[in-house]
Amino acid sequence: MLDREGFRPNVGIILINARNEVFWGKRIGEHSWQFPQGGIKYGETPEQAMYRELHEEVGLLPEHVRIVGRTRDWLRYEVPDKFIRREIRGHYRGQKQIWFLLRMVGRDCDIQLRATEHPEFDAWRWSQYWVPLDAVIEFKREVYQMALSELSRFVQRSHRAPLSPYGRGGPHRERDGRDNRAGGQAGRNDQNTRGQRQPPTLMVTTSTVIVETVITSRPAAQPIDSSNPDDTPSKDSL
Protein backbone atom coordinates (compact mmCIF):
# COMPACT_ATOMS: atom_id res chain seq x y z
CA MET A 1 0.00 0.00 0.00
CA LEU A 2 1.72 3.14 -1.27
CA ASP A 3 0.53 6.72 -1.20
CA ARG A 4 0.43 8.85 -4.32
CA GLU A 5 4.02 9.95 -3.79
CA GLY A 6 5.35 6.41 -3.52
CA PHE A 7 5.77 6.19 0.25
CA ARG A 8 4.58 3.22 2.31
CA PRO A 9 2.73 4.03 5.59
CA ASN A 10 4.78 2.72 8.49
CA VAL A 11 5.23 3.02 12.26
CA GLY A 12 8.47 3.41 14.20
CA ILE A 13 8.90 2.53 17.87
CA ILE A 14 11.24 4.09 20.43
CA LEU A 15 11.03 1.98 23.58
CA ILE A 16 12.67 3.43 26.70
CA ASN A 17 13.34 1.92 30.11
CA ALA A 18 13.41 3.56 33.56
CA ARG A 19 16.86 5.01 32.84
CA ASN A 20 15.76 6.58 29.55
CA GLU A 21 17.80 4.09 27.57
CA VAL A 22 16.36 2.93 24.25
CA PHE A 23 15.76 -0.57 22.94
CA TRP A 24 18.20 -1.24 20.11
CA GLY A 25 17.71 -4.38 18.00
CA LYS A 26 20.16 -6.24 15.76
CA ARG A 27 18.58 -7.36 12.50
CA ILE A 28 18.59 -11.11 12.16
CA GLY A 29 21.60 -12.48 10.32
CA GLU A 30 23.06 -9.01 9.77
CA HIS A 31 25.41 -6.60 11.51
CA SER A 32 23.01 -3.64 11.43
CA TRP A 33 20.97 -2.31 14.36
CA GLN A 34 17.73 -0.34 14.35
CA PHE A 35 14.53 0.56 16.18
CA PRO A 36 11.47 -1.68 15.71
CA GLN A 37 9.32 -0.59 12.79
CA GLY A 38 6.82 -2.01 10.34
CA GLY A 39 4.13 -1.30 7.78
CA ILE A 40 0.57 -0.25 8.52
CA LYS A 41 -1.85 -2.78 7.07
CA TYR A 42 -5.04 -1.80 5.28
CA GLY A 43 -7.71 -0.86 7.82
CA GLU A 44 -5.27 -0.44 10.73
CA THR A 45 -4.72 2.74 12.68
CA PRO A 46 -1.10 3.71 13.42
CA GLU A 47 -1.62 2.74 17.08
CA GLN A 48 -2.98 -0.69 16.16
CA ALA A 49 -0.05 -1.26 13.81
CA MET A 50 2.36 -0.17 16.54
CA TYR A 51 1.05 -2.73 19.04
CA ARG A 52 1.12 -5.47 16.40
CA GLU A 53 4.70 -4.69 15.39
CA LEU A 54 5.75 -4.39 19.04
CA HIS A 55 4.59 -7.95 19.65
CA GLU A 56 5.91 -9.37 16.38
CA GLU A 57 9.39 -7.88 16.71
CA VAL A 58 9.94 -7.47 20.47
CA GLY A 59 7.41 -9.89 21.98
CA LEU A 60 5.79 -7.27 24.21
CA LEU A 61 2.07 -6.85 24.88
CA PRO A 62 0.16 -3.61 25.52
CA GLU A 63 0.32 -4.19 29.29
CA HIS A 64 4.13 -4.18 29.13
CA VAL A 65 4.34 -0.58 27.87
CA ARG A 66 2.79 2.85 28.24
CA ILE A 67 2.44 5.30 25.36
CA VAL A 68 4.30 8.49 26.27
CA GLY A 69 4.02 10.37 22.99
CA ARG A 70 3.95 10.23 19.21
CA THR A 71 5.07 12.42 16.36
CA ARG A 72 2.60 15.03 15.18
CA ASP A 73 2.93 14.16 11.50
CA TRP A 74 4.46 11.67 9.09
CA LEU A 75 8.25 11.57 8.89
CA ARG A 76 9.62 10.40 5.54
CA TYR A 77 12.80 8.84 4.28
CA GLU A 78 13.76 7.60 0.83
CA VAL A 79 15.31 4.20 0.25
CA PRO A 80 18.38 4.20 -2.06
CA ASP A 81 17.86 2.57 -5.45
CA LYS A 82 20.28 -0.26 -4.67
CA PHE A 83 17.76 -1.59 -2.12
CA ILE A 84 14.80 -1.41 -4.53
CA ARG A 85 14.07 -3.80 -7.37
CA ARG A 86 14.59 -2.15 -10.70
CA GLU A 87 11.03 -2.73 -11.92
CA ILE A 88 9.47 -0.63 -9.12
CA ARG A 89 12.07 2.13 -8.80
CA GLY A 90 9.75 4.56 -10.52
CA HIS A 91 6.92 3.83 -8.07
CA TYR A 92 8.32 3.02 -4.63
CA ARG A 93 10.35 5.78 -2.94
CA GLY A 94 10.51 4.89 0.73
CA GLN A 95 8.63 4.99 4.02
CA LYS A 96 6.48 7.58 5.75
CA GLN A 97 6.29 6.95 9.48
CA ILE A 98 4.41 7.85 12.62
CA TRP A 99 6.80 7.37 15.54
CA PHE A 100 5.69 6.28 19.02
CA LEU A 101 7.61 6.76 22.26
CA LEU A 102 6.83 3.94 24.71
CA ARG A 103 7.80 3.59 28.35
CA MET A 104 8.66 0.01 29.37
CA VAL A 105 6.64 -0.91 32.47
CA GLY A 106 7.29 -4.64 32.22
CA ARG A 107 10.57 -6.44 32.87
CA ASP A 108 13.48 -7.17 30.57
CA CYS A 109 12.55 -10.85 30.63
CA ASP A 110 9.23 -9.94 28.96
CA ILE A 111 11.15 -9.14 25.77
CA GLN A 112 10.94 -12.18 23.48
CA LEU A 113 12.48 -11.89 20.03
CA ARG A 114 11.00 -15.24 18.97
CA ALA A 115 7.36 -14.31 19.52
CA THR A 116 6.56 -15.14 15.87
CA GLU A 117 7.81 -17.57 13.22
CA HIS A 118 9.57 -14.76 11.36
CA PRO A 119 11.66 -12.81 13.89
CA GLU A 120 13.14 -9.47 12.92
CA PHE A 121 15.97 -9.34 15.49
CA ASP A 122 18.37 -11.91 16.93
CA ALA A 123 19.94 -9.70 19.64
CA TRP A 124 19.11 -6.53 21.54
CA ARG A 125 20.49 -4.10 24.11
CA TRP A 126 19.66 -0.90 25.95
CA SER A 127 21.56 2.11 24.57
CA GLN A 128 21.82 5.75 25.57
CA TYR A 129 19.04 7.85 24.01
CA TRP A 130 21.10 9.59 21.32
CA VAL A 131 23.47 6.76 20.36
CA PRO A 132 21.29 5.46 17.47
CA LEU A 133 21.90 8.66 15.51
CA ASP A 134 25.46 7.57 14.83
CA ALA A 135 24.76 3.84 14.63
CA VAL A 136 21.82 3.59 12.22
CA ILE A 137 22.24 3.11 8.48
CA GLU A 138 22.86 6.45 6.80
CA PHE A 139 19.65 6.84 4.80
CA LYS A 140 17.57 6.56 8.00
CA ARG A 141 19.69 8.99 10.01
CA GLU A 142 17.72 12.14 9.29
CA VAL A 143 14.36 10.61 10.21
CA TYR A 144 15.89 9.19 13.41
CA GLN A 145 17.17 12.69 14.22
CA MET A 146 13.69 14.15 13.72
CA ALA A 147 11.91 11.44 15.70
CA LEU A 148 14.31 11.42 18.65
CA SER A 149 14.39 15.22 18.81
CA GLU A 150 10.61 15.68 18.64
CA LEU A 151 9.91 12.98 21.22
CA SER A 152 12.70 13.93 23.63
CA ARG A 153 10.47 16.53 25.30
CA PHE A 154 8.15 13.74 26.46
CA VAL A 155 11.08 11.90 28.02
CA GLN A 156 12.05 14.95 30.05
CA ARG A 157 8.47 15.54 31.21
CA SER A 158 7.75 11.95 32.18
CA HIS A 159 10.92 11.21 34.11
CA ARG A 160 12.93 13.14 36.65
CA ALA A 161 16.27 12.13 35.11
CA PRO A 162 16.95 14.66 32.31
CA LEU A 163 18.49 13.73 29.01
CA SER A 164 22.15 14.48 28.48
CA PRO A 165 22.60 18.22 27.75
CA TYR A 166 25.41 17.28 25.37
CA GLY A 167 22.99 15.53 23.03
CA ARG A 168 24.50 13.72 20.09
CA GLY A 169 28.15 12.79 20.46
CA GLY A 170 28.31 13.67 24.16
CA PRO A 171 28.83 11.50 27.22
CA HIS A 172 26.69 8.41 27.26
CA ARG A 173 26.32 5.19 29.18
CA GLU A 174 25.12 1.84 28.02
CA ARG A 175 24.13 -0.87 30.44
CA ASP A 176 27.07 -3.06 31.43
CA GLY A 177 25.26 -5.45 33.75
CA ARG A 178 26.44 -3.71 36.92
CA ASP A 179 24.65 -1.43 39.38
CA ASN A 180 24.68 2.36 39.42
CA ARG A 181 27.60 2.85 41.80
CA ALA A 182 29.48 4.83 39.17
CA GLY A 183 26.86 7.56 39.54
CA GLY A 184 28.30 8.64 42.89
CA GLN A 185 31.69 9.44 41.41
CA ALA A 186 30.02 11.17 38.49
CA GLY A 187 28.12 13.37 40.94
CA ARG A 188 31.31 14.34 42.75
CA ASN A 189 32.96 15.18 39.45
CA ASP A 190 29.99 17.39 38.55
CA GLN A 191 30.37 19.33 41.79
CA ASN A 192 34.07 19.90 41.17
CA THR A 193 33.46 21.27 37.68
CA ARG A 194 30.24 23.18 38.35
CA GLY A 195 30.32 26.62 36.81
CA GLN A 196 33.06 25.66 34.37
CA ARG A 197 32.26 25.12 30.72
CA GLN A 198 33.49 21.66 29.81
CA PRO A 199 33.92 20.42 26.24
CA PRO A 200 31.92 17.33 25.27
CA THR A 201 33.85 14.10 25.67
CA LEU A 202 33.09 10.58 24.60
CA MET A 203 32.89 7.95 27.32
CA VAL A 204 33.66 4.49 26.01
CA THR A 205 31.68 1.83 27.83
CA THR A 206 30.89 -1.84 27.50
CA SER A 207 27.24 -2.69 26.94
CA THR A 208 25.48 -5.98 27.48
CA VAL A 209 24.05 -7.49 24.31
CA ILE A 210 21.26 -9.99 24.88
CA VAL A 211 21.41 -12.67 22.19
CA GLU A 212 18.58 -15.09 21.51
CA THR A 213 19.15 -18.21 19.43
CA VAL A 214 16.81 -17.85 16.49
CA ILE A 215 16.50 -20.83 14.15
CA THR A 216 15.11 -19.76 10.83
CA SER A 217 15.50 -20.50 7.15
CA ARG A 218 14.79 -16.92 6.24
CA PRO A 219 17.44 -15.58 3.83
CA ALA A 220 19.25 -12.31 4.28
CA ALA A 221 17.24 -9.20 3.45
CA GLN A 222 16.71 -8.76 -0.27
CA PRO A 223 15.72 -5.70 -2.29
CA ILE A 224 12.08 -4.78 -1.86
CA ASP A 225 9.70 -6.68 -4.13
CA SER A 226 6.50 -5.30 -5.56
CA SER A 227 4.52 -8.55 -5.31
CA ASN A 228 3.16 -7.73 -1.85
CA PRO A 229 4.20 -4.30 -0.56
CA ASP A 230 2.92 -5.07 2.95
CA ASP A 231 4.93 -8.29 3.37
CA THR A 232 8.48 -7.68 2.17
CA PRO A 233 11.34 -10.03 3.11
CA SER A 234 12.51 -7.51 5.70
CA LYS A 235 9.04 -6.77 7.11
CA ASP A 236 9.12 -3.14 5.99
CA SER A 237 12.37 -2.66 7.91
CA LEU A 238 13.88 -0.79 5.00
UniProtKB/Swiss-Prot annotation:
Residues 171-181 have a biased composition (Basic and acidic residues). Pfam families: NUDIX. One of its GO terms (molecular function) is pyrophosphatase activity. Residues 6-149 form the Nudix hydrolase domain. It comes from the Bacteria. A motif (Nudix box) lies at residues 38-59. Its EC number is 3.6.1.-. Residues 204-217 have a biased composition (Low complexity). Residues 161-238 are annotated as: Disordered. Keywords: Hydrolase. Its cofactor is a divalent metal cation. CDD domains: NUDIX_Ap4A_hydrolase_plant_like. Residues 188-199 have a biased composition (Polar residues). Belongs to the Nudix hydrolase family. RppH subfamily. Accelerates the degradation of transcripts by removing pyrophosphate from the 5'-end of triphosphorylated RNA, leading to a more labile monophosphorylated state that can stimulate subsequent ribonuclease cleavage. This is RNA pyrophosphohydrolase. It comes from Ralstonia nicotianae (strain ATCC BAA-1114 / GMI1000) (Ralstonia solanacearum).
